[in-house]
Curated annotation (Swiss-Prot):
PROSITE patterns reported for this sequence: PGM_PMM
Gene of this entry: glmM2
Highest taxon in the source lineage: Bacteria
Swiss-Prot/TrEMBL keywords: Isomerase, Magnesium, Metal-binding, Phosphoprotein
GO biological process, one term: UDP-N-acetylglucosamine biosynthetic process
Protein name: Phosphoglucosamine mutase 2
Species classification: Bacteria, Pseudomonadati, Pseudomonadota, Gammaproteobacteria, Alteromonadales
Post-translational modification: Activated by phosphorylation.
Catalyzed reaction equations: alpha-D-glucosamine 1-phosphate = D-glucosamine 6-phosphate
Amino acid sequence: MSRKYFGTDGVRGKVGTFPITPDFAMKLGWAAGTVLASTGTKEVLIGKDTRISGYMLESAMEAGFSAAGVNVALIGPMPTPAVAYLASTFRADAGVVISASHNPFYDNGIKFFSNTGTKLNDAQELEIEALLEQALEHNALQCVASEKLGKVRRIDDAAGRYIEFCKGTFPNHLSLAGLKIVVDSAHGAAYHIAPNVYRELGAEVISINDKPNGVNINDHCGATHLDSLQSAVMIHEADLGIALDGDADRVMFVDHNGHVVDGDEILFILAQAAYQKGEMQGGVVGTLMSNLGLELALKQMGIPFLRAKVGDRYVVEQLKETGWQLGGEGSGHILSLQHASTGDGIVASLQVLKAILESGKRLAELKAGMTKLPQVLINVRLTSGSADSILSKDSVKQAVITAEEVLGNQGRVLLRKSGTEPLIRVMVESTDISLTQQQAEYIAQAVKVA
C-alpha cells in the first residue's frame, strides 16, 4: 500500500495550500498522537526551522496532539538532527520537525522521529495516514476527555545541549585552533548553533547568512546556493567554508581555492580516512544518484559500495540491514551512524575537519583521490499529468533506451520522480561531458512533451 501524504521526507508542500494548512496540521497532530498514544506515548518534542509559517503549524500541531492526550515539549528553531537527538535525551516518545529543509520559505513540511532518533517506518506512517484520512473525510476528530488533554511546555536550554552533543563527537585531543572557517547557516535553524560549535572547538569563524527573518531561509545561500560561501572563502582567505541547508541536515564544503566539495566527495574523504586508520567498518551506502566516480574510488581501496533508493531514510535502512556505518547522498546528507542516528550536517562537518587535522592535508588534497564523472541533472517541472504516468509512456522509455545505447558501457541513465516536488529528475553520467549533456537534454525534452 502506497503512502498518500508522506513523501520521502514526511509531508511537504506550499504553505496555505493543502496539505500544508493549519487544519491539516492539527488533524495530522491528532492522528499521529492517537497512533503514538496507543503504544504508550506520553510526550512529543516539536522543533522547527526559521520559516515564518513555522509558528502557525507548530500551534496547530500542538492542538492536535493535545486533543489526542499527548503532551508537547517545544524547543523552538532547531536543526532537524537536533530534534532527533533531543527527543531521545529528553526521554520524549517521539519528535516532530516542522521544516521544508532546503526549499524556499513559502514551502513547509512536517516529519516525525521515533524515540530512538530514527524516522518513522512506512508501516507507522500508513497507520497515521489511515486515521488522518478519517478525520479529513468527516471533518472531525475525537478529542479525549478534558482531564486527559495533553499539556504544553517550552524547553529553553535545547540549543546548548545540542551544541555540547556536536562537540562531543569531535576528539578531545584535537583542536580547530589555527583554522579560519567561513560558516553559511542559510538563515536557517543552525544560525545560533553551528558558528558556536566551531568557535568553541578553537576555530576562527566568519559567520554569514545567520540573520533569519522568517522569509530569507535558503534564499540564495546555504548548501544549495554556494556562490556567497565561495566568495567569502576567497575574500577572507579562509582555509575552507561550510554550508548547511535550512534545517542543517545536509552539508557542503568549499575548499581554500573556492572549489565545491559535495556529498559524494565527503563520503570518499570519510571512507578514505577510516580505511587508512584501519577503522573502516564494512562499506559505504550511496544512492541511485551517487556519482560513479565515488564507487570507482572506493573500489580501488577494496571498500564495498551499495546504492539505496534516493532519500536519507532509505540510506539509513540499507546501513542497518548491512550493519555498516557510513552512507549519504551527493546533496550533502551524510550518515555516520556511530555518531548520529540521522543525517547531521554539523556532525558530518566535524568528521571531515577531523580527517583534515589527522592527515595534515588540506581539503583540496583529501578529495583529490576521487575523480568525479561528468554528471548532468535536469529537473523537468510537471505542468500536467502525474510523474508515474509520464515515466510509463513509451516515448520516454524509448528515449532512455536510445541514450543508453549511445553511452554504451561508459555511462548510465536514471529517471526518477521527486518525492517532495512535482518534478522528474533526469540524470545522465558518462566519461564524456558533451555527450552527457547532449543525452540528458534529449531525454528531458522527451519528458517535457510526453
